[in-house]
Amino acid sequence: MFDVLMYLFETYVQSELDFMVDQDALTDELTRAGFQKPEIYKALSWLEQLAALHDSEDAPEYTACASDSFRIYASEEMLKLSTECRGFLLFLEQIRVLNCDTREIVIERLMELDSPEIELDDLKWVVMMVLFNLPGGENACHQMEELMFEPEAITIQ
């Protein structure tokens, strides 16, 4: 499923090409690209759930966390997210790429992936997808891109 998400993000979203709304045509194109239909359906469902967060009235605004807050991970989350991944999420909060709300969206989207354990690179791409989808997240998305592709260019404020 993650391969389908990456293909869609790189092909349509990140390249700013028009994203097909017709799910059948998109499914056919993804099948021609070599993806299996069950994986395509899972990925499209994952994206629909992410988009629903953007469209809902409960979409988080991009605000800072209270400096004294601390995230306690559930046992299922600890099994799926390594110490490295959890540390990276904390780092993203500390440099204000993520806030409390966006961190929770990222964790929720990571938990919905069908991988038993999340790799750090996969986490980074999910963060990009979430930030790209949220209104007001442009600066954070740009900072995340710099962190991914030009790690020496990131400035901690």
Curated annotation (Swiss-Prot):
UniProt superkingdom: Bacteria
Protein name in UniProt: Protein Smg homolog
Membrane-crossing segments per the record: none
Similarity annotation: Belongs to the Smg family.
Pfam families: DUF494
Encoding gene (name): smg
